Every structure is written in structure tokens, then in C-alpha cells.
UniProtKB/Swiss-Prot annotation:
GO terms for molecular function: rRNA binding; structural constituent of ribosome; tRNA binding. GO terms for biological process: translation. This is Small ribosomal subunit protein uS12. InterPro entries: NA-bd_OB-fold (IPR012340), Ribosomal_uS12 (IPR006032), Ribosomal_uS12_bac (IPR005679). It comes from Shewanella frigidimarina (strain NCIMB 400). Pfam families: Ribosom_S12_S23. PROSITE patterns: RIBOSOMAL_S12.
Length: 124
């Protein structure tokens, strides 16, 4: 236990919490430009071709962002919005692309969970 005099000389420092999404700078989303759109394979035991994009953000960071949903219209120089949220089986992918915002189109013919994929309500 520190004495009062020790605490006067050197106060207690609060613990600094490390963020999982440093490129967002405590913002909910960030805008960026795709520098490369490609597919990559997940860690064992999963097998697939996951769609990802390398994105240069407005704050200068260059990050890898996952493109969720079936099919996308992204290519190099597309302007997209990214949010936090890692992909567990893709090492180094800590961000998700927001579907239906800026240049990224929503998922077509999506019926359930539409808000997560930027899909409009279908005409019944």
C-alpha cells in the first residue's frame, strides 16, 4: 500500500485499455478506397474462398476488410465504408465492409437479416 506522500509525488495511473480496431480512431465507421479486392482461404479446419478488400482509409491506415454476403460489386478504387468486427477464421482481418453504403451495393434477393446486408424490403 502506497503512503499519502508517495501518491502525492506520483499518482496512480489508470490502466490503458487496448482497442481491437485501432484504425477506426474511436469512430463507429470509416470511409476508404479499395486498393485491392481478392479472395483468401481461411484457417483450418474451414475451407472456402473468402472475399476481402485491402482498403486505404481517410486517416491514412491501410487495413483488410471482409466483404460479407453473396456476391459483391467492389473493384479497385471503389469507395466503401468499413466498421469494426473481426473474422475469426481469417488472420489479420479485423474490419467488415458495410453493405449498401457508398459504392458497395446491398445483397440482391436477400429476404432475412436484410439490415445487415443493405437489402431493401421486397415487394410482396
Amino acid at each position: 500500500m502506497a503512503t499519502v506522500n508517495q501518491l502525492v509525488r506520483k499518482p496512480r495511473t489508470p490502466k490503458v485499455e487496448k482497442t481491437n480496431v485501432p484504425a477506426l480512431n474511436a469512430c463507429p465507421q470509416k470511409r476508404g478506397v479499395c486498393t485491392r479486392v481478392y479472395t483468401t482461404t481461411p484457417k483450418k479446419p474451414n475451407s472456402a474462398l473468402r472475399k476481402v478488400a485491402r482498403v486505404r482509409l481517410t486517416n491514412g491506415f491501410e487495413v483488410t476488410s471482409y466483404i460479407g454476403g453473396e456476391g459483391h460489386n467492389l473493384q479497385e478504387h471503389s469507395v466503401i465504408l468499413i466498421r469494426g468486427g473481426r473474422v475469426k477464421d481469417l488472420p489479420g482481418v479485423r474490419y467488415h465492409t458495410v453493405r449498401g453504403a457508398l459504392d458497395c451495393a446491398g445483397v440482391t434477393s436477400r429476404r432475412q437479416g436484410r439490415s445487415k446486408y443493405g437489402a431493401k424490403r421486397p415487394k410482396s
